[in-house]
Each structure stands twice: as C-alpha cells, then as structure tokens.
UniProtKB/Swiss-Prot annotation:
Disulfide bonds: none annotated. Pfam families: Pox_TAP. Associates with RNA polymerase to initiate transcription from late gene promoters. Signal peptide: none annotated. GO terms for biological process: regulation of DNA-templated transcription. This is Late transcription factor 1. Interacts with the late transcription factors VLTF-2 and VLTF-3. Interacts with the late transcription elongation factor VLTF-4. Interacts with itself. Induction: Expressed in the intermediate phase of the viral replicative cycle. Keywords: Activator, Transcription, Transcription regulation.
Length: 260
C-alpha cells in the first residue's frame, strides 16, 4: 500500500506542516476517498488538513492506513527528485521507515537515435511508526453553537499586547463573542459579531490559553481570515474553538480546547 503524489502537492504539504512539527500522522480513508494529515502542537492544540484523493494524490490500496511521515526530513530531500516527479510514499510499519521513490525518463540523442534514459531515486527515512494517531476528525464537526470570522493579523496584534497574561476569558453577549483579559486594571477586550450564536451559549464563559492562540502565528503568511466556530460533541459538551480555512488546494483546521 502506498500513496502516489505529485511533487508540487507534496512540497505544499511538507512546507506547510514543517513550520509546526517535525512529523505528522497520515490517515488514508479509502472509503470516503480522503487523506487526513494530523499534528498535535501541544497545549491542547491540534491541526489537520483534509485532502481529497484525486489524480494528484492517489492511494494504491483497498484498506485504510495510518502512518507517520517526517515532514522536516522530506522537505530537505525533495531536491533529489525531478521537478515533474510523481512520488510513491510507502510506509514500512515493521521497520519504522517510510520510503520515497520515483523515476524519470529522458530521451538522449545517441548517434541520431533517441535513446530513453531512466533515472530511479529511492530514499528511506527513519521514523517511529509505533505511535501513529487515529484522530477522530469528525468529532469536531458534529455540532456548532457559534460562528464568526476572525482577521488573523488583527488577532495576533491583540494577543501581542497582552503577552503578560496566561489566558483570555471568552464570553458571549448579544450575539457577540468577547475576548477579555482578567481583571479590570490595564484590561484589554476584543469583540466580534457572530453570524450564528445559540441562546444557550450566551449563558457560559470559558478560558483559552494565550499560548494556544499564539500558535496561529505560523499561518500569518498564508491566511487572511479564519472561519471560527464554537464546537460541541453529540452530548452537547462545548469543546473549544475550531479555526478553518482553505490554504492553497487543501482545507486546514486548527482546534483549541477551552481550559478547565
């Protein structure tokens, strides 16, 4: 079982995720024809991309598969492949490896006769395959009780001014979401109108770590605004905030849990 992927698509993925983590977990769902890429950033922050299987990302297998990919190592070695290469990614779960392979054929004039010359490249990279994550992505899309749009650069400017604090209080009032620093002295507050806000939600307040919000800084060059949702599970437990956007050709989700 392997994934065949165009090198341009692989470059997008590894360039993006290597800014946040040295490795990611890849989950291929052959039934839904989707590939999920997941990384845990710490501090109750998870990031994942959802990529449809297509001509540029093709799965050669019938069963679902989960494996780890060392994105930092892959990013460093992609210069070994031709710019038009289609790369096979084949995990070796038993030996804690992942293999990248590709070939390229060029025609060379040899005594006025074109001769095909084939170049094969294979790279084996070590990575612990025993700790792959099976992440329930659908859990965070089951229910939404609040929705707004947040301009990333303005949010980053706001939290830069409050770096002396450890968390923000999240409140809801008059169909607005309010982010406020603790106390009344030297207090900062940011308010967003919401396109969706349940009446039940406006009875609660939560806390979110500023260190978690700071992890959005890695998106600064790629994202202008995030669709932001307050998400619940099927038992109506409010889980946290889900930031979503489409980056290049794939969808990105970042989930941040509210503090207890």
């Amino acid at each position: 079982m392997s994934i065949r992927i165009k090198i341009d698509k692989l470059r997008q993925i590894v360039a993006y995720f290597s800014e946040f983590s040295e490795e990611v977990s890849i989950n291929v769902d052959s039934t839904d024809e989707l590939m999920y890429i997941f990384a845990a950033l710490g501090g109750s922050v998870n990031i994942w991309a959802i990529i449809p299987l297509s001509a540029s990302v093709f799965y050669r297998g019938a069963e679902n598969i989960v494996f780890n990919l060392p994105v930092s190592k892959v990013k460093s070695c992609l210069c070994s492949f031709h710019n038009d290469a289609i790369i096979d990614i084949e995990p070796d779960l038993e030996n804690n490896l992942v293999k990248l392979s590709s070939y390229h054929v060029v025609s060379v004039d040899c005594n006025k006769e074109l001769m095909p010359i084939r170049t094969d490249t294979t790279i084996c990279l070590s990575i612990d395959q025993k700790k792959s994550y099976v992440f329930n992505f659908h859990k965070y899309e089951e229910k939404c009780c609040g929705r707004t749009v947040i301009h990333l650069e303005w949010l980053l400017g706001f939290i830069k001014c409050i770096s002396q604090h450890q968390h923000l209080t999240i409140m809801f009032k008059d169909d607005n979401i309010i982010m406020k620093t603790p106390g009344n002295t030297d207090a900062f507050s940011r308010e967003y109108s919401m396109t969706e806000c349940s009446q039940e939600l406006q009875k609660f307040s939560f806390k979110i770590a500023i260190s978690s919000l700071n992890k959005l800084r890695g998106f600064k060059k790629r994202v202008n605004v995030f669709e932001t949702r307050i998400v619940m599970d099927n038992d109506d437990n409010i889980l946290g905030m889900l930031f979503s956007d489409r980056v290049q050709s794939f969808k990105i989700n970042i989930f941040m849990a509210f503090l207890d």
